[in-house]
Amino acid sequence: MMYKIVSIPGDGIGPEVVAGALDVLNAVAKKHGFEVSVEEHLFGGASYDVHGSMLTDETLEACKNCDAVLLGAVGGYKWENLPHDKKPEAALLKIRKELGLFANLRPARVYDALVASSTLKTEVVQGTDFMVFRELTGGIYFGQPRGYDETRGWNTMVYERYEVERIARLAFEYAQKRGNAKVTSIDKANVLEVSQFWRNIVHEVHQDFPEIELVDMYVDNAAMQVVRNPKQFEVIVTSNLFGDILSDISGMITGSLGMLPSASIGSEHALYEPIHGSAPDIAGQNKANPIATIASVAMMFENSFNRPEVAADIYAAIEGALAAGFRTGDIAAAGEAISSTTEMTAAIVARI
């Protein structure tokens, strides 16, 4: 079995954390007896400096013709003053659109060794492990009309039936794989007609999955419940705006953005990346936490390659390294020894 992966390290700490993730990828390939082909391309500011474009046709074509894309990070101070449509973030939106990535998956998983790193009490967060499915291409971020003038501003939240159906179906299918995990659909159906539509469609899709429990929850209550009792959630499915906010709230339960992977999924393509930024202030200093990018590789094996046993090995190796006391600066408590990017990577590879 050969997996064809496109690596786009990007900017800032991106090349460092992607290098660590590829070390882990090679380790699991050797253990499980499959081959990987990794093709590297420039993206973001790194591409702009060489080609005058944040996303070249060559890079985009490579991403369309691989099994999965692994992204490091994009952006930085150097490119902040470029026109909006030339910035790295615009290139990220373009690649998501071109690849048809309609679902963003963000896990909220608290590792036992890092329970104390959360700002919440241990008894509240210990055992937390849920997945947020955020619709990525519809909703208020893309609806028309939109704009503002001197007296008012306006945006439009719109969802098509197919957009709600496909994200709901993806969430229910994932819940099946997790032993018929409970699905919580989050909306604002008490005041928004588009949320009433969302709820109706989710319930229609649920009829194909009668063995799965479905719970409806208003977004304001959900924000409170994620902090009050995060263990009640197993799978969350929600719209673009609500998912944008809730996934960040959920992520901080874990204690550091450096721990959090993500996946953007489409019908034919998928892109995996850490949720942290490019952190130009520590770039090139061997200080970055590679765990989010390494865990993104685990998500790749779960979702794109249907190899949960490979993903489980990666998660276990991460847990083992943390249990052994390895800590990068972002997750180290006062007085704890700080590991470099390469030291943390080596500790995880050794436990594959």
Curated annotation (Swiss-Prot):
PANTHER family from the UniProt entry: 3-ISOPROPYLMALATE DEHYDROGENASE
Ligand binding (substrate): 96, 106, 134, 220
Which SMART domains does the record associate with it?
A: Iso_dh
User: Main EC class of this protein?
Assistant: oxidoreductase
- What SUPFAM superfamilies does this protein map onto? Isocitrate/Isopropylmalate dehydrogenase-like
Listed pathway(s): Amino-acid biosynthesis; L-leucine biosynthesis; L-leucine from 3-methyl-2-oxobutanoate: step 3/4
> A Pfam family for this UniProt protein?
Iso_dh
The entry describes its oligomerization and partners as: Homodimer.
Provenance organism: Chlorobaculum tepidum (strain ATCC 49652 / DSM 12025 / NBRC 103806 / TLS)
Residues that bind NAD(+): 76-89, 277-289
Co-factor requirement: Mg(2+); Mn(2+)
Its localization reads: Cytoplasm
Record site: Important for catalysis = 141, 188
Keyword tRNA processing (UniProt): no
For this entry, the protein name equals: 3-isopropylmalate dehydrogenase
Q: Gene3D superfamilies this protein is in?
A: Isopropylmalate Dehydrogenase
Q: What is its EC number?
A: 1.1.1.85
Give the catalytic activity.
(2R,3S)-3-isopropylmalate + NAD(+) = 4-methyl-2-oxopentanoate + CO2 + NADH
Molecular function GO terms recorded = 3-isopropylmalate dehydrogenase activity; magnesium ion binding; NAD binding
